[in-house]
């Protein structure tokens, strides 16, 4: 059980979670929840990432997830982390298989092209074409071997920092205080099995779930709304949330 959970239990769920202190000095699990236009959570909301803050100023991120919020019902923080870890690993091997299949198709197409060109004769032009095709085949085989030998490695914890600011792009929430978290996550490259380190900035402000715990299938969550996500349309909501006990009073931003 995290230190935050211990504190909440001792206070009967009545203590507010102090941010950013709870992220930097306590061992706890948070998650990104996408709930579209609705202002209430439901079991079909998507958990797109799970974060383990270690209480030492670091965070371990499992991104690219596609979990239903209802899948977390009745689970504790450790079990939620295990779900995230398993799906993150499955995504690695799914990506590996997709790349293998894609490269196999490309290699087969080049082999057929090579046979077709070879049948054109033995001119200098044909030999040049075959040479270029062979070079492409060699390059693709190297890529295929790199994919084939790739093995899963768990992501690493990264330092997290924060600042406070105001969110001024929303006319209804102009000058509202926001907490800005900055840290790095590891994501798979689209065309290889390499993990890329990407810097993430989360702009968090008070939203629908700051003051009171919202219930989904017997589990309760509080959180802050994430503002300014790329590609978001108006009314498309994402929240940065954690698991709490029933009756919990929510979150308090402390500068």
Regions found by a protein language model. Give the residues of each.
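Short, exposed beta-strand-loop hairpins at the edges of beta-sheets
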Residues: 229-243
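N-terminal helix-cap/turn-to-beta initiation motif at the start of protein domains
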Residues: 14-31
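C-terminal motif of bacterial Sec signal peptides marking the signal peptidase cleavage site
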Residues: 7-10
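Contiguous, well-ordered beta-strand patches that form the walls/edges
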Residues: 40-46, 58-231
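Long, solvent-exposed N-terminal ectodomains/accessory regions
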Residues: 49-54
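Short, low-complexity, Pro/Ser/Thr/Gly-rich segments in the mature regions of secreted, periplasmic
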Residues: 241-255
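Short, solvent-exposed loop/turn elements at domain surfaces
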Residues: 16, 35-44
């Amino acid at each position: 059980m995290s230190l935050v959970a211990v504190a909440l239990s001792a206070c009967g769920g009545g203590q507010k979670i102090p941010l950013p202190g709870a992220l930097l000095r306590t061992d706890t699990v948070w998650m990104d929840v996408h709930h579209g236009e609705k202002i209430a959570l439901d079991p079909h909301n998507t958990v797109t990432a799970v974060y383990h803050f270690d209480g030492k100023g670091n965070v371990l991120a499992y991104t690219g997830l596609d979990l239903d919020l209802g899948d977390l019902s009745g689970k504790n923080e450790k079990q939620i982390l295990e779900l995230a870890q398993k799906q993150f690993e499955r995504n690695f091997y799914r990506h590996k298989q997709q790349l293998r299949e894609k490269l196999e198709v490309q290699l087969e197409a080049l082999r057929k092209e090579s046979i077709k060109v070879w049948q054109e004769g033995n001119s200098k032009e044909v030999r040049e074409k075959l040479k270029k095709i062979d070079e492409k085949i060699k390059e693709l085989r190297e890529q295929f071997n790199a994919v084939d030998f790739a093995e899963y490695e768990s992501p690493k914890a990264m330092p997290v920092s924060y600042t406070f600011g105001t969110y001024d792009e929303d006319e209804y929430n102009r000058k509202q205080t926001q907490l800005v978290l900055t840290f790095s996550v590891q994501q798979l490259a689209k065309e290889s099995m390499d993990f890329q380190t990407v810097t993430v900035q989360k702009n968090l402000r008070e939203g629908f779930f700051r003051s009171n715990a919202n219930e989904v299938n017997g589990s309760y969550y509080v959180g802050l709304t994430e503002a300014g996500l790329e590609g978001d349309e108006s009314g498309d909501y994402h929240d940065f949330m954690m698991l709490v006990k029933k009756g919990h009073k929510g979150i308090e931003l402390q500068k």
